[in-house]
Amino acid sequence: MKVVSFKICPFVQRVTALLEAKNIDYELEFISLSDKPQWFLDISPNGQVPVLITDGDKALFESDAIVEYLEEAFPPLQADTSPEDRATNRAWSYLASKNYLVQCSAQRSPDQDVLDERSAKLGKAFDRMEKQLGDTSFFGGEDVGMVDIAWLPLLHRADVVEKHAGYDFVGDRPKLKAWQRQLMDTGLAEKSVAPDFEDAFANFYLSDQTFLGRGGKVENRCFAGACVTDACC
């Protein structure tokens, strides 16, 4: 099984984190989004990552579809869940994935005012999850589930930003903060990205081109010749 990837794409990390959580063997192939190879364009109708190439040599695209396939084709992370619970989990997972690009935009903010505005949008999703979380280690209990996997890219990036730039997207949300720490402690965040993920992430989001990096005016440029928002799904 192979995942075609771009190093700092949160949609890719959702897929690779699920593969790691299920202990499924896979390989990663990174491509340049500024010079997409023809073989990739042939199997990705939207020209976006991730693409999962199954052991049966079938190319699957769109991260939502890929994670549904992995949950159906391999033993589920949480067995014996009801149809209602699975639907609820999909809804909370969707709240995460629809905010991946919101967080990406906030991380690229050129100044404090823009950062505040964009962070407020992400904060609304965080507020909703803060109210939903209980006293268990993870979203649905004491084991990692599909909702945890969906939220991991958001909380991982928030952790990296806080560590490198001192800005805390999670803020004063104690349950969300505890959940973030539990997820980081699983090791799934590090296992589901490239070894040089933090360097690549910092070069794009925490450079002198962004307020979180050094502040000041930012030019509208793209990482490695391709905007993240145009290339991830």
Positions of predicted regions on the chain:
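Surface-exposed helix-capping loop/turn segments at secondary-structure junctions
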Residues: K131-E142, G187-V193
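Alpha-helical scaffold segments in carbohydrate-active enzymes
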Residues: R14, A91, L95, R128, ...
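GST-like domain detector, emphasizing the conserved glutathione-binding G-site
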Residues: M1-F139, D208-C233
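A contiguous, mid-protein "functional segment" used to position or interact
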Residues: G166-F204
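Amphipathic C-terminal alpha-helical segment
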Residues: S105-R108, R157-H164, A189
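GST superfamily/GST-like fold recognition
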Residues: G141-H164, K175, L183
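Non-catalytic, well-ordered alpha-helical scaffold segments
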Residues: D64, A87-R90, D148, L152, ...
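Short alpha-helical "patches" and their helix-cap loops
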Residues: S82-P83, Q112-A120, H164-W179
